Amino acid sequence: MLASPALAGARAFAATVSGSLGIPIPAISAPSPSQARRRASLVVVAKVKVSTPQADRIARHVRLRKKVSGTTERPRLSVFRSNKHLYAQVIDDTKSCTLVSASTMHKSLSKDLEYSAGPTVEVAQKIGEVIAKSCLEKGITKVVFDRGGFLYHGRIKALADAARENGLDF
């Protein structure tokens, strides 16, 4: 069997160490072809795609935006929620402009809203009422609802229901 240069170097190093230190080092030999095949067959490569909840939400939102678009007649009611705030805006996608917006960041609303650990369902209902009233003042009665990739549950549902109850049609 032919020895590789690396194997020859390892043998030479072992002989040098063994001779100079007086420590016996066992002989280094190359694996037999069957051993090499067995070792090579044990190598397993696994590719795992890791996704985060935020990445999943963005993917849902991209899928949703392919189907939902706001027009001048029916603008898009877009909702975004974070851990601290809740935002809603009515957007005309043909002109790329925001027509109406409401959020927990607005000074007029933040004075009325009291919460410490992020917006609650009651806060979402208040935002839904405000956005619906603002839309009706501007003459907007029909919108397309864009949940922003979030599940239609909890705060998102409360905002949508409050907007419907106050005159928006979607």
Swiss-Prot record:
Transmembrane segments: none annotated. It is found in: Plastid, Chloroplast. Keywords: Chloroplast, Plastid, Ribonucleoprotein, Ribosomal protein, RNA-binding, rRNA-binding, Transit peptide. InterPro entries: Ribosomal_uL18_bac-type, Ribosomal_uL18_bac/euk. Belongs to the universal ribosomal protein uL18 family. Binds 5S rRNA, forms part of the central protuberance of the 50S subunit. NCBIfam families: L18_bact. This is Large ribosomal subunit protein uL18c. It comes from Oryza sativa subsp. japonica. The lineage of its organism: Eukaryota, Viridiplantae, Streptophyta, Embryophyta, Tracheophyta. The gene is RPL18.
